[in-house]
Amino acid sequence: MPPAQGYEFAAAKGPRDELGPSFPMASPPGLELKTLSNGPQAPRRSAPLGPVAPTREGVENACFSSEEHETHFQNPGNTRLGSSPSPPGGVSSLPRSQRDDLSLHSEEGPALEPVSRPVDYGFVSALVFLVSGILLVVTAYAIPREARVNPDTVTAREMERLEMYYARLGSHLDRCIIAGLGLLTVGGMLLSVLLMVSLCKGELYRRRTFVPGKGSRKTYGSINLRMRQLNGDGGQALVENEVVQVSETSHTLQRS
C-alpha cells in the first residue's frame, strides 16, 4: 500500500521571471501541484538566489506576501494609530507585549514620569531655628549667675573678682537668651508661613481638580475615560473610548 501523500502548491516561474530584472512587474505566477511522499523523492529544482521563505504545510501562495507588501506601500493612510506595518509574511517585528508597552507609554506621555521631589529647605530651616533657640534659652537659664561661695572664707579682693566675672557672665547669658528668643520667633514665623502656603496650595489644587479642564481625561488600564458635557441638564458623564488595538493587523492577516 503506497504511503500517505500530501499536496503542496508552489509558485512556478513564468517566462517573464526567467528574463531577469528587465521586467519589473511580472505576470501573476501560476500554481503547480507537487507531491510529498515518504519514499524516494524526485530531484528538486535549484534554489533561487534570493531569500527563501520557510516551507509550510498545506496550500501556500507565493505571491500573497509580495502583494500584501505592495498594498501596504500603496495605501499608507489606511494604517491606524498604534499599529505598525508588518513585514512580508505577516511576521511582526516586535513581540506583542513590547508593542503594548510602547502604546501605553505613548498614551500616558511624559507627564507620568517619576520626578524626584526637592528637599523642603524652608521647613528644615524653621526646625533648625526652633531647636537652636530652645537650646540657647535652656543653657542660659541653667548656668548660675552668682558666686556660690562663703564670703567669710574668701578675701575681699577675691570676692570682688568673682563678682566681676559673674557680672560679665550674666551679660553674656542675657545676650544668649535674647538670641534664643529671636531664633524661636523667626522659626515660628517661618513655620506658620510655610503652613499657610501649603494650605493655600492644597485649596487651589482641590479647586483645580474639581473643575474639569477642556480636554481632561483619565486612563484606567486599557480604557480611556473623559468627561463630556451633556446637552440637557448640564451635568457630566463618563464616556468610554475604545483603545486602538495594536494587533489588529495580525488579526486581519489571519482572517484573510
Curated annotation (Swiss-Prot):
Biased composition (Low complexity): 80-96
Location within or outside the cell: Membrane
Skewed-composition ranges (Basic and acidic residues): 97-108
Residue ranges of the region described as Disordered: 1-111
Transmembrane segments: 123-143, 177-197
Major subcellular site: membrane
UniProt keyword Isomerase, yes or no: no
One cellular component (GO) term of this entry: membrane
Entry membrane topology: Multi-pass membrane protein
Keyword Transmembrane helix recorded: yes
Keywords assigned by UniProt, alphabetized: Membrane, Transmembrane, Transmembrane helix
Pfam families: Neurensin
Family: Belongs to the TMEM74 family.
PANTHER family xrefs: TRANSMEMBRANE PROTEIN 74, TRANSMEMBRANE PROTEIN 74B
Name of the protein this chain belongs to: Transmembrane protein 74B
UniProt source species: Homo sapiens
